[in-house]
Amino acid sequence: TAPILKGQVKVYTSTSPETIPENSPIAITNISSGKMTIVTNDPSQRYYYLMVFNNKYRIKVATRNINIPGIQNFRDLGGYESAGTGKSLRWGMIYRSAQIDSIPPCSRQELKNMGIRTIIDLRSENERHNYPQLHDDEFNIIHIPILTGNMEEILQGIQEEKIKSDTIYRLVEQMNRELVINYQKEFKKLFTVLLDRTHYPVVIHCT
């Protein structure tokens, strides 16, 4: 912290973001140290942390990026603040990722350990048919197709360095405009799903 603050920070943990008991801290350090390392015993579990500064100020945190075999760019959207209300999105409620298809059993179990109930698939029909589909009765899989052009060709062009950085910027800018203008019905359906509390926790994924 800057300026340096006196006192201690205590860290408590739980696999539930809503219930983190404060009876026994897993770590204590001076606030002035600025950092600490916590090693978890079970990597298949998702842990949330409550940091208590000088037994007064409290903040919940968790890792943003989550490493799940077979799923790229899996992230927790918790902690982001709403510009309109100033409130923060709850941890462990909404995740986003790249495509989720024929993932190994260990990855399915990790999603279940996180309590995932609903998987919202935003891929087009063509994108979905190019990959094996995820079939698991424990997840409510909802398909809301949103076309974003030939994403596979774009990604391949980036990997082969055939598409320049300024071109990527223009493509993304154009894509974002098209999403807002052309897919209002699809986004309405998406937010209708998100308004139902029984669907949570939710993963939203694209290609």
Locations of the language-model features?
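Extracytoplasmic, non-cytosolic globular domains
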Residues: 205-207
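Cys-dependent protein tyrosine phosphatase-like superfamily
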Residues: 1-203
